[in-house]
From Swiss-Prot:
SUPFAM superfamilies (UniProt xref): ACT-like, Carbamate kinase-like, Dimeric alpha+beta barrel
Gene3D superfamilies: Acetylglutamate kinase-like, Dimeric alpha+beta barrel, VC0802-like
Name of the protein in question: Aspartate kinase FUB3
Protein's job: Aspartate kinase; part of the gene cluster that mediates the biosynthesis of fusaric acid, a mycotoxin with low to moderate toxicity to animals and humans, but with high phytotoxic properties. L-aspartate is suggested as fusaric acid amino acid precursor that is activated and further processed to O-acetyl-L-homoserine by cluster enzymes aspartate kinase FUB3 and homoserine O-acetyltransferase FUB5, as well as enzymes of the primary metabolism.
Keyword Transferase belongs to the record: yes
Source organism of this protein record: Fusarium oxysporum f. sp. lycopersici (strain 4287 / CBS 123668 / FGSC 9935 / NRRL 34936)
Pathway annotation: Mycotoxin biosynthesis
Amino acid sequence: MATELKEYLVIIPDLPDVLAKRQVLLKPHNQDAAPLVKAGRVPFFGSTLAHHSPEGQQVAENGTVMIIKAESEEEIREIIRKDIFTIEGVWDFGKLSIWPFKIARMRNRRDNSWVVQKFGGTSIGKFPDKTSSDMLCTKFRKESLRNNEQITADCQELLDYTSAAKRFNLDINGKAKDKMVSFGEKLSCRLMVAMLRDRDIPAEYVDLSDIVPSNNLDQLKPEFFHEAAAVFGKRVEACNGRVPVITGFFGTVPGSLIDSGIGRGYSDLCAVLVAIGLHAERVQIWKEVDGIFTADPREVPDARCLPSITPSEAAELTFYGSEVIHHLALSLAIQAKPPVSIFVKNVQKPWGQGTVVVPSDGDDTSSWPIDYLDPSDSDSTSSTALPKMPTAVTIKRDITIFNILSNKQSMSHGFFVKVFTILAEHDISVDLISTSEVHVSMAINSSNMEPSQIKNVQCRLSEEGEVNVLPDMAILSLVGAELKNMTGIAGRMFAILGEQHVNIEMISQGASEINISCVIPDKDATRALNMLHDELFTKSAI
């Protein structure tokens, strides 16, 4: 008679400092475990940033987490030593922790263990087409009659809205843009609710487009986000066990959601606000790429997916051209109590490693979410310390440089005040700046500026001095938390560009010391990006 196998949760801590440093590459788990995985003896094999025992004590800062089916704890230890790990010294077997899985599962989760998943419009557009043959069945076709009426009504409302705007020649202001943008997300959410219900998953459509109480604020303030998070959380909790399918568009936002300081990527912010309101464990940002890369893989074929990144690094990459995570979403997620962990995953490869945004050594981790990664969060377990390296390199295009030489009719502080007052009058933000007492160079994102607007700004600035405008430029940025500890990295970066005859118009290094940027001609941007990545990432990693 066969002995019944029991499920055990097993945690094997890594040796000190293996994962503590930023420069880490996670490799696929040991192939020796594959037969056991296929046989069902190891149904889950993943990695952990930190883990608590069922009694509440922290037992692992970093390491490997598994679910193993075995007759006893003694058999588990033999399985681990003989069948899974062949390299001694990477894992600390003396601190092996084993619990019956049912107990660990019940006691090691938060009481309110929400996970917020965000899918972009492109993902939603591809997902139904890819899976329709499996998900659309007879029941869906019957229920689709009612769903079709709702979608038709939404479409008709949008058509009426745009028709009225054309008929009466109405100006399309920020609020009108918000209204029109919201329809696409409403339609997508209704479709996803129908598809989930077809799979016998109870789902509820949640419309956040008018949920935030209207106020008289003209500008976004922290109080607005606190209020929005609380309102979102209450609305989602009202679903009472049904899966909420939420519109990424939300309102009413002071000024406008699209034209305010939020703009593109607002659905990232919405997901984080929902997570904060629910005290969720994590936010998963699902994209069409494997995670956050060392460079844009569309321009740099050798770019690698980063297993982890710090919030400050992610914010720098977002600001300087990489479409990573909305900067406000990052800021709010890290400032929340407890902070919300963020995972970036590939919607087409949900089993992939992805990238996790984790606090750096200098961040307060006392209230950071503590849990092991589930199978959808990681398929990697081992790590190898690497030499100090930058984290990523990125390009931000559509940059225009304004060089202003003071006419010396005012003191330097008065000169700068007048320059920035002119920019503020035209709602222009400066991406990079370099100054002296009588000279200032500014790199400005001109992607949304009309040529006439640039000309008007130039004319106004010419009142304060001689103005030289350089269009068609790009900001090349090297980002990494370890840059401040890499002596000579700036010189090496500029030497590489100089050797390839790439002209540098401006140089800037942030006060945080995690970013070195320069402005170069846009025509050289792709070449410069590949050269830096090849020298500082590909060759340095060999």
